[in-house]
């Protein structure tokens, strides 16, 4: 599992598995992206980020406040080819991002600093950090940084049908564990928070069926939870 100490000390070239050198962003590129994002800040209020995937259950960041909320206009989609972390170039999986349309519930965090966040999320620059309005469940509306999939990125995948991506997620694994573990952690966190994402239902059923067929005795690969 990713921790704050892991992120602080991680060498991005090796810590998450083998990443194609042409895709890997340097510390300078990440710093420039962060500066450009903050320069577009729509107000002088605190900096919030919106977690819709692993940021929900394992932010690995210091934050001063958190609150559940809803992002309108975007929906979860496993549209990022996963070749590190929980997948490899030879056995790629799929990672979560956001695509236009619909709505997404998640967790917003108010951050005291953002540098480590960029190291966590922007290793290959696959996202477009975008300021969006969030409707928090306590009644507030805040501007937050949301990591939206960049469709121009080489690892963007447009086909997110369950029958296409379920076999990939069921099979992929890497230094951080299995791809299925990520999907099931998302399912558990949504249940814990009383949230529902109907777009995940078919995918969850398909991945669980594939794992049951491949591991009939319930013996799963290391890292599965």
Predicted regions and their residues:
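A glycine-rich, hydrophobic/aromatic-adjacent loop/helix-cap motif
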Residues: 1-225
